[in-house]
């Protein structure tokens, strides 16, 4: 299937993000260039590297939202990380290579899901057979002659890394007929609420040291997971829920994980995208403390990843040569030139995102596919209340949000969420007890509820 064109990508982003056309175009072109590169001969492909993007702009103007929506649009492995979470090598914390390992995990998840779809019908059939056997169990054999054989089979299975072998059973004609009847009812969906006892793999217990080890790039549970036998527990569940769990287990048995890992590594390396947020927070612009040294160290650790290197993952080595990196930051107290020169050079495309105007706020309230106003209307619809905003009310909300941003810290579109929550506080509180009907939010109501916010000079409680 042909990839989405740059114009189609921008059109999709327009459904959720107001303005910032330059940023949308840059991202769309970079994404489509991946498709162009894939059409070229291999000897040419290897010399064409992605043009990484650096987005700079005030907080709340859409940088992170562009990344979030990209993940929904592109059919490629995508991870978003925060630069402030990383520490340079030698310090306690996450090392920068963990972002590449996260991308590998995401690629495996995507490919695994695709492979599961291919074997889903077969897995459902096998799960239904298991359910029939559980609902109408056979007669278990228990004689001295086969006890030694069962013991040998059990030992062989455990040594091979499998679980306990299934017990042999005897199926009489009566049981066979009952199973045929139950199988027919299962197919017709008549037994979905019947309870059945199944054995499922026990979920791993939370390890207090797990988070610390994970931050240091060491996932011991994953490393040892395949070596240790899987413990199973019995659960009593309705047939519908039991089938889902059994289908998941059957799908894992039917797919070839070696192929999945190989495809995933190839996809992550050729079409993966890593979005690095808050990159301005690791600049060394502030020289007043020793933190600048550590921040510059993080930049130097990120540099080889962005330049192109090979990172070891639990699925195999992953090359970052053709991964697209998109970095973003507000740069309120620093500027892109405060990054080390080598790292600046690895982000050749610079995009400046503009501060939001009052007209932008009006569009943000109304235009996006799931705008804030539409969200509140849907929430109150659950109580049987029809919420309506007049055009004048929307204009006034945008005006107040813009004024508060100008008078205090400018937090962009995030200010609208604070303003709307204050405006609709009473309606949301009384909503469940109101009789079904329509509530119209007018300009006068907005002024009544929010006038104090504009008049009061101490607006700290309205800062997110």
UniProtKB/Swiss-Prot annotation:
The UniProt similarity line reads: Belongs to the ClpX chaperone family. HslU subfamily.
Q: What is this protein called?
A: ATP-dependent protease ATPase subunit HslU
The signal peptide, as residue positions, is none
Sorted alphabetically, which PANTHER family does this protein's record hold?
Answer: ATP-DEPENDENT CLP PROTEASE ATP-BINDING SUBUNIT CLPX-LIKE, MITOCHONDRIAL-RELATED (PTHR48102), ATP-DEPENDENT PROTEASE ATPASE SUBUNIT HSLU (PTHR48102:SF3)
Q: Where in the cell is it found?
A: Cytoplasm
Q: Per the UniProt entry, what species is this protein from, by scientific name?
A: Lactobacillus delbrueckii subsp. bulgaricus (strain ATCC BAA-365 / Lb-18)
Keyword Chaperone, does the record have it?
A: yes
Name the encoding gene, please: hslU
State what this protein does. ATPase subunit of a proteasome-like degradation complex; this subunit has chaperone activity. The binding of ATP and its subsequent hydrolysis by HslU are essential for unfolding of protein substrates subsequently hydrolyzed by HslV. HslU recognizes the N-terminal part of its protein substrates and unfolds these before they are guided to HslV for hydrolysis.
Q: Which SMART domains match?
A: AAA, ClpB_D2-small
